[in-house]
C-alpha cells in the first residue's frame, strides 16, 4: 500500500484549491477537517469502515452524526468523496497536510511548546513573541506538558527543535563527561 502522505497529498491540495477559490474561511475549514480526521482515527470507526456489510452511506451517516457541529456542505461533500474512494484511513494525514498548506499560504507555522510546568497565558504570549523573532515567522503555539523535561522548555517547529530544557542540558553534560 502506498504511503498515506502520498495518498493524502492530492486530497489536501484539492481541498485547499477549492477552499481558496470559493473564498471559504480557511481556519473554519481547518477546524472541520481536523474534527473529521479525529473521528476517522478512532479505532472503532476504522473497524466499522472495514466491515464489508457497512455501506458508504451508512458510514457517512455515522461520521456526520458523530461530528459535534453541523458540518457545512463543503465538509459533507469532501467526506463523501473520501469515503467513496476508500480513503478514510488517510483522512488524518489529509487534515495535517491541509493545515500545512494553510500555514504556508499565511506565512506561519505550527509550534509545539513542551514544558515541565503549566504556562500561563501572559508567559505564553511573551514566549510566542520571542519565538516568532527567533524563527522569523508567525507561530501558532500549542502547549504540551512533559514532566520528564525537569525544567525549561522544548519548542518544535516543523523539523526545527529548540531545546532549553534541564533534561537536554544534563544529557549534554553527560556526553561531555563520557567523551
From Swiss-Prot:
**Subcellular location, record wording:** Cell inner membrane
* GO terms assigned for molecular function: proton-transporting ATP synthase activity, rotational mechanism
- The answer to whether the entry has keyword Membrane is yes
The reply to whether Transport figures as a keyword in the UniProt entry is yes
GO CC terms, sorted: plasma membrane; proton-transporting ATP synthase complex
Known function: F(1)F(0) ATP synthase produces ATP from ADP in the presence of a proton or sodium gradient. F-type ATPases consist of two structural domains, F(1) containing the extramembraneous catalytic core and F(0) containing the membrane proton channel, linked together by a central stalk and a peripheral stalk. During catalysis, ATP synthesis in the catalytic domain of F(1) is coupled via a rotary mechanism of the central stalk subunits to proton translocation. This protein is part of the stalk that links CF(0) to CF(1). It either transmits conformational changes from CF(0) to CF(1) or is implicated in proton conduction.
Would you tell me the protein name for this molecule?
ATP synthase subunit delta
The gene for this chain is: atpH
Amino acid at each position: 500500500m502506498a504511503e498515506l502522505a502520498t495518498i493524502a497529498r492530492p486530497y489536501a491540495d484539492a481541498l485547499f484549491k477549492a477552499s481558496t477559490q470559493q473564498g471559504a474561511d480557511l481556519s473554519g475549514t481547518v477546524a472541520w477537517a481536523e474534527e473529521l480526521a479525529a473521528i476517522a482515527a478512532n479505532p472503532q470507526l476504522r473497524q466499522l469502515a472495514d466491515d464489508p456489510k457497512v455501506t458508504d452511506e451508512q458510514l457517512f451517516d455515522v461520521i456526520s452524526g458523530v461530528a459535534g457541529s453541523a458540518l457545512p456542505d463543503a465538509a459533507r461533500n469532501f467526506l463523501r468523496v473520501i469515503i467513496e474512494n476508500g480513503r478514510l484511513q488517510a483522512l488524518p494525514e489529509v487534515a495535517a497536510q491541509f493545515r500545512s498548506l494553510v500555514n504556508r499560504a499565511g506565512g506561519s507555522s505550527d509550534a509545539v511548546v513542551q514544558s515541565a510546568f503549566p504556562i500561563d497565558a501572559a508567559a505564553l504570549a511573551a514566549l510566542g513573541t520571542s519565538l516568532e523573532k527567533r524563527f522569523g515567522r508567525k507561530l501558532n503555539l500549542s502547549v504540551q506538558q512533559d514532566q520528564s523535561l525537569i525544567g525549561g522548555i522544548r519548542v518544535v517547529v516543523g523539523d526545527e527543535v529548540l531545546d532549553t530544557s534541564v533534561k537536554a542540558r544534563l544529557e549534554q553534560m553527560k556526553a561531555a563527561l563520557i567523551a
